[in-house]
Amino acid sequence: MKLAVASDHAGVALKARVLEQLLSEGHQAADLGTNTTDPVDYPDYAKSLALAVLGGQAERGVLICGSGAGACVAANKFKGIRAATCHDSFSARQCVQDDDVNVLCLGARVIGPELALDVVRDYVGARFSGAERHRRRLAKVTAFEAEFGAPRPN
């Protein structure tokens, strides 16, 4: 699979481990930064990753910040991105199978590296089920994006 991986400063070490695992398993994995522990802003890396997924440079993404929450909020602002923060394997599989999630968010300060690598492996290995009920629900979410995704007037 072709993946993009990005993090803020809190996730640099975990990002390196994730990239190493993905490459060793035969995936293509682009490192979208950061590569420093100097403080940076996670929305900048969420944007780079979201644009890579939306632009077709990656099929899916893995985005890492301290908690996983901020990165997830930022990524979900991009129309067509379905990001989920997962810190267990069941959620990582289920979010793809049922919700066709295309960005996995991890909290480097929440999850240990070994569990994180299992979560990433399960996320990458999962496929959208395509079940009618899930397609119907995703169509409703997509309609929300179309109706409510426009900027609010001042």
Predicted regions and their residues:
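Helix-adjacent hinge/juxtasegments
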Residues: 48-86
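Glycine-rich phosphate/diphosphate-binding loop of Rossmann-like nucleotide-binding domains
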Residues: 1-25, 29
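C-terminal binding/interaction regions
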Residues: 2-6, 10-13, 89-154
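Short amphipathic alpha-helical segments
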Residues: 16-19, 73-77, 117
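Short, structured coil segments at secondary-structure junctions
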Residues: 25, 78-79, 99
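A short beta-strand-loop structural module common to alpha/beta enzyme folds
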Residues: 28-39
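Structural motif
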Residues: 38-47
